[in-house]
């Protein structure tokens, strides 16, 4: 298996047609078909369902597509990291994070960093903590921002001083919007939208106590933006950290803090004892300088 064949496979998967893919790759269609057929034979499984008009992926093909994208991304990161010119720092830094207030701290750090190293491209990948953690372990994300609790074994990190408050989102004309704080009894019997992350749900379960079993959970969501869209359409009340809904227009969605309050700390973390590129090492220096 080589990178070239994976690129061929991904192009066919994208175009869903061998002829169009061959044109994109500047090779003949028979050559492309022959090489991918040999690739399927090497793997011992079919990757494509070949229809009369289009091509779709088998289950094995879908799995390979996901892994192939990770491999291509990792290859590009390696090439970027090796292209450090003397006296000039270039390359790409990938930062994984969710939607929370600490992203404002990240923006402050990135602003200082970009003034010093304008040739470095910063890629922001928005995802759940579990996804970011997995991608860090795979080498696809250099730096992650996590809400606690998070397993910091094997990680170096700094803790952001400002805490994120937990809030309930609602339409501005909702009766709950008239309250200064939302108590757990206000939410019993109402359709709720909870975070998807199990450890966060456990924290909310502790807050609700024995009433947790009475909750009407209409949705779970891994990102606050999508939960906010559901709430704006009257489909539920998202319980999330304040940063996830901070930038909603107040004529669309408002938020009220819960009482008794729950606050959550945030960490910026990176893997320990990893030979990072110079661009990433300089970013870590800026992160540590911010803490100091």
Q: Language-model features: where?
A:
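Hydrophobic two-helix hairpin corresponding to the core of helix-turn-helix DNA-binding domains
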Residues: 9, 21-22, 39, 58
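Short helix-boundary/capping micro-motifs
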Residues: 10-28
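A short LG(V/I)-centered, amphipathic sequence patch enriched
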Residues: 40-59
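Short beta-strand-centered segments that line the small-molecule binding cleft or hinge
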Residues: 66, 85, 108-112, 129-166, ...
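Central regulatory/effector-binding core of bacterial HTH transcription factors
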Residues: 88-152, 212, 220-223
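Beta-alpha-beta core module
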Residues: 153-159, 163-165, 222-273
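Flexible hinge/capping segments at coil-to-helix
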Residues: 155-166, 170-192
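Secondary-structure junction motif
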Residues: 190-212, 276-280, 284
